[in-house]
Amino acid sequence: MKRFLLATCLVAALLWEAGAAPAHQVPVKTKGKHVFPEQETEKVWDTRALEPLEKDNQLGPLLPEPKQKPAAAEEKRPDAMTWVETEDILSHLRSPLQGPELDLDSIDHPMSDDVQDEEVPQSRPILYRQVLQGPEEDLDHLAHSMEDS
């Protein structure tokens, strides 16, 4: 049953994408004409797509403003393509830092030679090998009281 339902859904989806199964259209009566809402919407969008965007300046705040080259440069080469430069707002992140890096070695390493000559005490204690003979002593009583048993 599940396979049949899955196959039916897949066939319906494929027919829908291919356009074999048209969508149900209900006529809307307006002023004596039968108009289908989908067709009316397409006409409206087609006419709005042809209108220039500068009229309302809807995308103005979203797009960066291009920097125009001087008119003298365009007059020299009228047949050449004109390049429009835009401001790179991420340039400070891509460019390396100016000047040398800060020397922070003195934090971990002393600067003077006198300090290097002295022996620095080892921070790790020297571990001695202990050879066990026989079974290990039971030390559980140190962590657990006798009342727990």
Curated annotation (Swiss-Prot):
Q: Which GO terms describe its cellular component?
A: endoplasmic reticulum; extracellular region
Keyword Endoplasmic reticulum recorded: yes
Compartments (UniProt record):
Secreted; Endoplasmic reticulum
**Keyword Cell membrane found:** no
Q: Which InterPro entries match?
A: PRAP (IPR027922)
Keywords of the record:
Endoplasmic reticulum, Lipid-binding, Secreted, Signal
Q: Which GO terms describe its molecular function?
A: triglyceride binding
- Enumerate the PANTHER family for this protein: PROLINE-RICH ACIDIC PROTEIN 1
Q: What is this protein called?
A: Proline-rich acidic protein 1
Gene symbol here is Prap1
